[in-house]
């Protein structure tokens, strides 16, 4: 298992158009301080993040879908078995119907997906769901991102421990300026406008946490990551609350 995880770090999937995003300018999270953080593995390869939103459901990006996935909860150090880890093989995926499955189209509209676990997660201090944000975030709000994505770009160096970074919600006009013609009302940009901090390859699908709730899902961004005036793009969760509730209830 440890050898497989080592291989995973060396063979993380590349992005399509917009790069799968990574955490630049991040520091190691305090172990299990983000108990909702999940890692998505295809075979032995860690390639996306996700967020536990109940004991049976995860929220992630639709472009993270694979024929089947392994989910790991309670994870911090990828090479060590530390006790609270839980492993699930998942096959029940619910991508938003508006998502364009042709990843070469560079269309990140409705880039959001629910994953149903085959059994209930065992909740503990290291495994806890995160509440969804019931309101849309405002520019200037301070938020937190986390993931095992690369900590350097364009030459990608991947961490073995979960990384965290504080970033800011940016004004919509800056998001449109950075990516003209690609930004819809259900997206938001976050990071530092001057660059140097934000998500990157391997962080896709992971959480943007604002005021202790899930406000965004990491969707995409520019390559190299965290360049000045090229912030990461997130799917704004507040626009999908009704859809999420409908899928989870039915």
Swiss-Prot record:
Coiled-coil boundaries: none
Subcellular localization(s) per the UniProt record: Secreted
Uppermost EC category: hydrolase
PROSITE patterns named in the record: TRYPSIN_DOM, TRYPSIN_HIS, TRYPSIN_SER
Tissues where the protein occurs: Skin, thymus, trachea, cerebellum and spinal cord.
Family annotation (CDD domains): Tryp_SPc (cd00190)
Major localisation: secreted
Protein name: Kallikrein-9
Species for this entry: Homo sapiens
């Amino acid at each position: 298992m440890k050898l497989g995880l080592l291989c995973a770090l060396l063979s993380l999937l590349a992005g399509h158009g917009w790069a799968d995003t990574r955490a630049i300018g991040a520091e190691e999270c305090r172990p299990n301080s983000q108990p909702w953080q999940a890692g998505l593995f295809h075979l032995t390869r860690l390639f996306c993040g996700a967020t536990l939103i109940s004991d049976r459901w995860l929220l992630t990006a639709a472009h993270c879908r694979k024929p089947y996935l392994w989910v790991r909860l309670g994870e911090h150090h990828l090479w060590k078995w530390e006790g609270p880890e839980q492993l699930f093989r998942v096959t029940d995926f619910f991508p938003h119907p508006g998502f364009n499955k042709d990843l070469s189209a560079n269309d990140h509209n409705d880039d959001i997906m629910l994953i149903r676990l085959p059994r209930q997660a065992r909740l503990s201090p290291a495994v806890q769901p995160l509440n969804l944000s019931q309101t849309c975030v405002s520019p200037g709000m301070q938020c937190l991102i986390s993931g095992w994505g690369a900590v350097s770009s364009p030459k990608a160096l991947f961490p073995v421990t979960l990384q965290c970074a504080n970033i800011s919600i940016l004004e919509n006009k800056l998001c449109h300026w950075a990516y003209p013609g690609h930004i819809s009302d259900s997206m938001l940009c976050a990071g530092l406008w001057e660059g140097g901090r934000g998500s990157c390859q391997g962080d896709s699908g992971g959480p943007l946490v604002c005021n202790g709730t899930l406000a965004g899902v990491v969707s995409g961004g520019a390559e190299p990551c965290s360049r000045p005036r090229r912030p990461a793009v997130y799917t704004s969760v507040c626009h999908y609350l009704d859809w999420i509730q409908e899928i989870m209830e039915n």
